[in-house]
């Protein structure tokens, strides 16, 4: 079984994550030391400020710079953290933003109160476009005023729910997250790492916290998800 970090910003100079190759290599070495086998590189994609073709080109260039260092780092798979936008379920090129070789899309939901149309868009991504949707850092959307019923509707869809590792260390949030993992409404962990000194690679801390609370076998199940 491979240990996978499903959410990271380790590619240099492409978003608000790593600023340069040196930082990227440092982050990736930290991940290797923590036992991570596969890093899903998920730079931010915002449809209102980027074209898919240009994004994919920039992502490939950033990846090539990292690989040119020939460092001992985890295997990197290309993906994106796709910010929700109106019409996403009808956008023609979003298939290029899935995790390479799969139909899996890491989707960042709106940071405002959702709506029926948002729920319908997610449903259409699944049912009409046949994407497997991972909801990025679900914990950030649970406390948005008026969001409870919409979150519940989305969680009733066949989605995978990702939780940031740091949330499992936060005394204000970890109880709810452990409960979600226990009842099957949260499924995987991501570090959402952005740098060497801020929002650092910390997948192992989240895995350790989950293991202490729910058991080592439970964490191993995540690795087979």
Where are these regions (language model features)?
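An N-terminally biased module of ancient metal coordination in phosphate/nucleic-acid-related enzymes
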Residues: 1-72
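Extended substrate/RNA-proximal surfaces in nucleic-acid metabolism proteins
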Residues: 50-162
């Amino acid at each position: 079984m491979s240990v996978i970090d499903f959410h990271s910003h380790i590619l240099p100079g492409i978003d608000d994550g790593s600023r340069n190759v040196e930082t990227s290599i440092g982050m990736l070495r930290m991940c290797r030391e923590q036992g991570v086998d596969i890093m899903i590189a998920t730079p931010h994609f915002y449809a209102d400020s980027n074209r898919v073709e240009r994004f994919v080109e920039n992502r490939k260039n950033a990846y090539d710079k990292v690989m040119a260092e020939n460092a001992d780092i985890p295997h990197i798979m290309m993906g994106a953290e796709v910010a929700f936008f109106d019409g996403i379920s009808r956008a023609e090129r979003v298939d290029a933003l899935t995790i390479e070789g799969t139909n899996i899309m890491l989707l960042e939901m709106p940071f405002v109160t959702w709506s029926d149309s948002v729920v319908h868009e997610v449903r259409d991504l699944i049912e009409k476009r046949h994407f497997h949707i991972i909801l990025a850092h679900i914990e950030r959307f649970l406390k948005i005023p008026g969001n409870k019923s919409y979150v519940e509707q989305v969680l009733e869809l066949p989605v995978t729910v990702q939780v940031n590792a740091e949330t499992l260390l936060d005394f204000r949030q970890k109880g709810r997250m452990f409960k979600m993992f226990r009842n099957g409404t949260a499924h995987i962990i991501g570090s959402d790492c952005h740098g060497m000194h801020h929002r650092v690679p910390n997948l192992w801390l989240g895995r350790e916290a989950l293991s202490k609370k729910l058991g080592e076998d439970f964490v191993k199940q995540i690795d087979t998800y």
